[in-house]
Amino acid sequence: MAARLCCQLDSARDVLLLRPIGPQSSGPPFPRPAAGSAASSASSPSPSDESDLPLGRLPACFASASGPCCLVFTCADLRTMDSTVNFVSWHAKRQLGMPSKDLWTPYIKDQLLTKWEEGSIDPRLSIFVLGGCRHKCMRLL
């Protein structure tokens, strides 16, 4: 299962908006819950939230407080969608000075999203691809 989503940070509401790319792109955005939310990492959104989701199939962990477990940081330039690169590998080559992997999560949460908000981030990060997940997909009608 894969879905192409365009991510936008809404700092006023402290949410990450995920908008579908493709024929269903006219649907409403799905805001990721704030980090302080009480949802578990494997929980699915409530039935009232499901009607707001523009995609037909999403993993059950999609709306968890920690984000979807299947978020594979694969990115592509909007102009050349067929040439994707693995964001983790791509970024690791630029961050060789990081002392440990324990800094990766705080970096994503603080530094990367701050750069995104300021508009100083590389345009290759405009598209993320949701990849394989151990959770089952939920059908949205």
UniProtKB/Swiss-Prot annotation:
The GO annotation for biological process reads: DNA-templated transcription; symbiont-mediated activation of host NF-kappaB cascade; symbiont-mediated arrest of host cell cycle during G2/M transition; viral genome replication
Where in the sequence is the signal peptide annotated? Answer: none
Q: Which domain of life is it from?
A: Viruses
**Positions of region (Mitochondrial targeting sequence):** 68-113
What are the boundaries of the region Disordered?
22-52
Keywords, ordered alphabetically: Activation of host NF-kappa-B by virus, Activator, Apoptosis, Host cytoplasm, Host G2/M cell cycle arrest by virus, Host mitochondrion, Host nucleus, Host-virus interaction, Modulation of host cell cycle by virus, Transcription, Transcription regulation
**InterPro entries given in the database record:** Transactivation_prot_X (IPR000236)
Predominant location of this chain? Answer: host cell
Provide the protein's localization.
Host cytoplasm; Host nucleus; Host mitochondrion
One Gene Ontology term, aspect cellular component: host cell nucleus
Here the segments flagged for biased composition (Low complexity) are 33-48
Summarize what the UniProt record says about post-translational modification: A fraction may be phosphorylated in insect cells and HepG2 cells, a human hepatoblastoma cell line. Phosphorylated in vitro by host protein kinase C or mitogen-activated protein kinase. N-acetylated in insect cells.
Function as written in the Swiss-Prot or TrEMBL entry: Multifunctional protein that plays a role in silencing host antiviral defenses and promoting viral transcription. Does not seem to be essential for HBV infection. May be directly involved in development of cirrhosis and liver cancer (hepatocellular carcinoma). Most of cytosolic activities involve modulation of cytosolic calcium. The effect on apoptosis is controversial depending on the cell types in which the studies have been conducted. May induce apoptosis by localizing in mitochondria and causing loss of mitochondrial membrane potential.
The record ties this protein, via HAMAP family, to:
HBV_X
Family that this chain belongs to? Belongs to the orthohepadnavirus protein X family.
Q: Could you give the subunit structure recorded for this chain?
A: May form homodimer. May interact with host CEBPA, CFLAR, CREB1, DDB1, E4F1, HBXIP, HSPD1/HSP60, NFKBIA, POLR2E and SMAD4. Interacts with host SMC5-SMC6 complex and induces its degradation. Interacts with host TRPC4AP; leading to prevent ubiquitination of TRPC4AP. Interacts with host PLSCR1; this interaction promotes ubiquitination and degradation of HBx and impairs HBx-mediated cell proliferation.
Report the protein name in the record: Protein X
Which organism is this entry from? Woodchuck hepatitis B virus (isolate w64/pWS23) (WHV)
